[in-house]
Structures are given as structure tokens and as C-alpha cells.
């Protein structure tokens, strides 16, 4: 173990000085990383591997073009019943042959919080070097760890300064504070306190391997059929795995694919389209010139680099040229989108890794010094109180308005009910008054009222 760590440290000694990261802090200073494809893509660039990118997989059944491998993020809780089922299932496919293990790159995770880097290296260092340019750091690591045990390979990863610095440079400030507060352990996703873990799925020598740094051995899921791609085998394995893992309705997982850099393929296609565009345009110019001269006997043919030699009319070439122009415009837009996406990865990384604590503390201190902080805090707290008070006031006003409306309705009904009898009584009173006026008597007094008046006068006397 000491030989593996020391050898890698010596090979990368100059890089440790440049990165200013003490070797004593490498083994216990790795920070947690988020599960983000943009972060992983930039991390690969920092490793020195510029021809790959990481994409998130949303649909397992959707075909993926030329993937190097897959990275699976899942919840890691040992006591779960589903977890025990997975362990019992995978124990049957462990590869325990030392020669077979040493022939592939399988490293045990001996450094906490390094599972993201382990997952990426498990994919990249098991790819064919003819199809992928690893870069100086990864090429040196692969050559140095050839034939080592999985434990020594894990120590070599932990003691490589370039990998440690690149890994920690993409961590959020909360990760460092959390490491100082709780210590190292299994990586947790987005700092929620729940443990998550990365594993890799990669094709090796016609067989699908699952490489998990927390397992003692690599797992061989077997070969795929002759008529299918290795990704078909991977889909079946993942379908079974998710069926077991989601037995308790826990579907929190993330799947990412390590694929070639899309910009390289688009750039190559644009180069081919522009070459064909120049050929067709030149042939069309010659054809138009020949038609102007009336030389139909020597009509030019399209070169065999585009199609088989055959006579084309000017209209055919113009239509072909128009299609090429459209394809070029579409691919130029795709290339611009990929470049914008890569730039957005960098912007998100800057926002993710920047420590805003000093700015926030200074800003709040200036507000307090100017005597504005208390007022701002009260203004932001009052709306909540106002909303609760207004809701109560609204309820009271609604109740009072409803009571007032009910009272008004009842009064209106009572008034409407008494209006007809009162009209009849008034009509009856008006008839004797009119008769009394004719007879010369007072119209406003009745016999009963006169008696009451006389009684009152007697009492006064």
C-alpha cells in the first residue's frame, strides 16, 4: 500500500507544488460533489480528458449514441430491506479471480467522498485508448496502477494531487463546512443528510461489468446477445435493479452517460458538408458556364466523392446545394447550442463554488451601520403578520356584512308584509274624516279619544 501511494506521489510531485495542496491532506480532504452532468463534464476537462462529456439520462429506453459507460447514483442505506436483496443478488456475480481483476481497472474507495471521481475513472480507464485520449494525468495513472490490487489502486487515486485538486475545485462551500463539522463518510447528495453513492457500468471484453468502489470485487453481468448492443444488456440489468430497489417506493436515483464530446462529431460533420457544398457549387458553376457556351457534349459530372458519376442538370445541383445549405445551418445551430451549453456549465460552476459568506456579512454590516437593517427586517416580517391579520379582518368583515344583509332582508320583508294592512287602515280612517268634514265636525277626533282626554283632565284636577 505504501509503495502504491509513494509511487504515485513521486510521479506527481511537481503538480502538488503547483496546486499548493499538502500531501498530508489528500487522503482525508476530499469533498462531496453534487450529481450534475455539467460538473462531471468540467471535472473531466480538469483531469485532462477533453474529448468526452457527461449527459443525464431521463429515458432508459431512448437510444444513446456511442456511450463509453454509465454512472448510476442511488441511495446507500445498509439496513434497508431492498439493499439486502441487492447485496444477495450481486454477491453471485462477483469476480474473485485475481488475474481477471488485475486485467481491468477496479479500485476500492479508500478515500471518503471520492466516489464521483472513482466512478468517472472506472469508465475512462477501462476504455480503449485508440478511441479515447485520456490526457497526461490519467494515462500516467493507468500505466502506474497496472497490475495493482484494487486497494492499492484506490490509494493511488487518493494520492494523486491533480485529481484531488480538480475534484475539490468543484465542491460547494457547504461541503467543506460539513466535512469540518461531521467528518468524512459516504457522500451525500446536495447535503440533505441522506447518503448517496456512485457506481459505474462499462463494457469490458464483451461483458458488462459493474464497478463499485465500496464492494470488495467487480461484478460481471455477463455477455450480451450477438444481435444487440451492450446498452441493451445494461437496460435489462437496470430494469431489474430498479425493480428491486423501488420495492419500498423509493425511486430517488440518477443516471448519467459518459459519451463522446458532441461538438467533435458536429464539427466533423460540418467539415464534410462544407466540402460537399464546395464540390457541388463548383460543378454547378461549370455546368452553367457550359450551358452558356452551348457545349452540351462536355457536360461535367459530379465527383465520385459525393455520388456515383452521373449527369446532373442545373436544377438538380441547385436543389442539392439548397439541401446542403440547410444541413449546414442546422448543424451550425447545434454547434452553437453545445458551445452555449458548455459556457453555461462554467457559469453554473462559478456560482456553485463561489463563497458568498463574506459578501453577505459585509452587506449586512453596512446596512446595520446605516441604521437600515432593522427597518428592512421589520418590513419583511410585517407582510406575514399583515397577511394573517388581514385574513382575520376579512373573515370578520364578511361575517358582519352577512349579518347586516340578513337584518336588512328581514326588515324589508317585514315592511313589505305590513304595507297592505296599513294602506287599508288609512283608507278606512279617511272615509269618516271626509264625512265629518261635511257635517262640520272635527275630523281628527274619535269618541274613544275624547273619553281618554276627559279622563286625563279629571285626573289633573
Curated annotation (Swiss-Prot):
Residue ranges occupied by any ULD domain in the UniProt entry: 355-383
Biased composition (Low complexity): 400-446
Major site of localization recorded for this protein: nucleus
A GO cellular component annotation in the UniProt record: chromatin
Enzyme class, UniProt record, top EC level: hydrolase
Residues of the site described as Important for enzyme activity: 212
Catalytic residues (positions): 115 (nucleophile), 197 (proton donor)
Residue segments, region Disordered: 392-461
KW Cell membrane (keyword) present: no
Protein name: Ubiquitin carboxyl-terminal hydrolase calypso
Species in which this protein is naturally found: Drosophila mojavensis (Fruit fly)
